[in-house]
Design a protein with these regions (language model features):
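Conserved ATP-binding N-box helix of the HATPase_c
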Residues: 258, 288-319, 328, 383-388
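Acidic ATP/Mg2+-coordinating residue in the GHKL
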Residues: 338
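Short helix/loop segment immediately N-terminal to the Walker
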Residues: 187-189, 266-273, 278-280, 310-318, ...
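Flexible, glycine-/charge-rich segments associated with ATP-binding catalytic modules
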Residues: 2-3, 18-74, 95-101, 126, ...
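Short acidic-aromatic loop segments in the C-terminal HATPase_c
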Residues: 352-356
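Glycine-rich G1-box
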Residues: 341-342
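Conserved catalytic core of two-component histidine kinases
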Residues: 274, 323-327
Length: 456
């Protein structure tokens, strides 16, 4: 039975000794043959926790976990073991990157963040929210008073640690991107390395999204700093149980439009249509993380506006961007159509490639600004956000006319399950196996001179 199911079931039932009886205390000892205490140093700790697979949660489980029955103690017990597992799994893959990439200052900085975060989390591995002696002890207090104070202190310390880790990892994406640029500029990129780096970054950034989701949920639910703005009071952590899709789309459009107006002094209009096939006549709502959806549509709007403005620059008339939203029994689909001239078929894959970008190199210290072009990571990261809860993002282009971008999101919260990378033999082989030659004929860039071939 997965660790997540044990703990989430306990969360709904309320706190108690049942977790220990269910085998939670044995989850990192009985199956592995050793305990983390027996491993020495960071490499040993990483090796130990990387032996375990992450426990993916569904959107429904996130909702149940953050409901009125939510228990901070259960969140503490789950995260103190799940977060090291997720960190260690991806840290093993970081160590398999090319040596020259690992030596870049930016990648070394990212590694140091992950090591520090893992060590801070492991400070809690032997502590209990109810273990008074582990956290706090004062003379002249009754055991009940001490236990209550210690339980509160432990949870507060852990929550502060979670918030500190979340803030530390704020710039993981641009910093790792900077490392890839440093490597590319110094050593160039061959096809095999490019393929391995693409494989790694997809998994690394997906892991980062999942870790941040856990950190955000705990800090927003138990951070103790109020409920946020009135518009977010119905949220469960970062999840809106009734996310109004059209409102998020309009928000993304307006913000992208402001940037477009600043840069091009004009912008295309928006034509928005919705079709609720599941509940006709009702607004389209779905259980989702609004910030994830916003990231996707904002990125797509920026791309569509940029293409439209540049393709029609000489005409002075800019066709509108059309967005169609439909909700069916299984999928929520958002299709964004522009008339920005499209992209040749051979270039579509490049748009999702981290190693390929025509944009000028940005500075990391200004990475929090939102330009119309940056590292070239907008589309691949947006695709990962869509895939994180079993959705997807696809591009369909008509060269000379325009592009359709389609976002797929699961309509049911029970189907929206985390997609998590796991370090195993298959992943290891991907980094260490020599890729064989293509088993299909690859056409040359120039046509062959057939006069050089003579019949026998």
């Amino acid at each position: 039975m997965r660790l997540a199911r044990l703990l989430l079931g306990a969360a709904l039932a309320g706190p108690g000794p049942g977790l220990r009886a269910a085998g939670f205390s044995r989850s990192f000892s009985s199956d592995s043959g050793s305990s983390p205490a027996s491993e020495r140093g960071v490499p040993g700790q990483v090796d130990f926790y990387a032996r375990f697979s992450p426990s993916p949660l569904s959107m429904k489980q996130f909702l149940d976990f953050g409901s009125v029955n939510a228990c901070e103690k259960t969140s503490f017990m789950f995260l103190r073991q799940e977060l090291p597992v997720r960190l260690a799994n991806i840290m093993k893959e970081i160590s398999l990157l090319p040596d020259n990439l690992l030596r870049t200052p930016s990648v070394q900085l990212v590694q140091s963040w992950y090591i520090q975060s893992l060590q801070e989390l492991l400070d809690f591995k032997d502590k209990s929210a109810e273990d008074a002696k582990a956290i706090y002890e004062r003379p002249r207090r009754t055991w009940l008073q001490v236990s209550s104070l210690c339980c509160m202190a432990c949870k507060m310390i852990f929550t502060d640690t979670v918030i500190r880790i979340r803030n530390r990892h704020n710039d993981v994406i641009p910093t790792m991107a900077q490392g890839v640029i440093e490597y590319k500029e110094s050593f160039g990129v061959d096809p095999v390395t490019s393929q391995n780096v693409q494989y790694f970054l997809d998994r690394f950034y997906m892991s980062r999204i999942s870790i941040r989701m856990l950190l955000n949920q705990h800090s927003l639910l138990f951070g103790g700093k109020g409920k946020g703005s009135p518009s977010h009071r119905k949220h469960i952590g970062s999840i809106n149980p009734n996310c109004n899709v059209l409102e998020v789309i309009k928000d993304g459009y307006e913000n992208a439009r402001r940037l477009c107006d600043l840069y091009y002094i004009n912008s295309p209009e928006l034509e928005l249509e919705e079709l609720n096939a599941k509940s006709p006549g009702q607004p389209i709502q779905v259980v989702y993380v609004p910030s994830h959806l916003y990231h996707m549509v904002f990125e797509l709007f920026k791309n569509a506006m940029r293409a439209t403005m540049e393709h029609h620059a000489n005409r002075g008339v800019y066709p509108p961007i059309q967005v169609h939203v439909t909700l069916g029994n299984e999928d929520l689909t958002v299709k964004m159509s522009d008339r920005g001239g499209g992209v040749p078929l051979r270039k579509i894959d490049r748009l999702f490639n981290y190693m390929y970008s025509t944009a000028p190199r940005p500075r990391v210290e200004t990475s929090r600004a939102v330009p119309l072009a940056g590292f070239g990571y907008g589309l691949p990261i947006s695709c990962l956000y869509a895939q994180y809860f079993q959705g997807d993002l696809k591009l369909y282009s008509l060269e000379g006319y325009g592009t359709d971008a389609v976002i797929y999101i699961k309509a049911l919260s029970t189907d929206s399950i985390e997609r998590l990378p796991v370090y195993n033999k298959a992943a290891w082989k991907h980094y260490n196996t020599n890729h064989e030659a293509d088993d299909w004929c690859v056409p040359s860039r120039e046509p062959k001179d057939m006069t050089t071939f003579r019949s026998a």
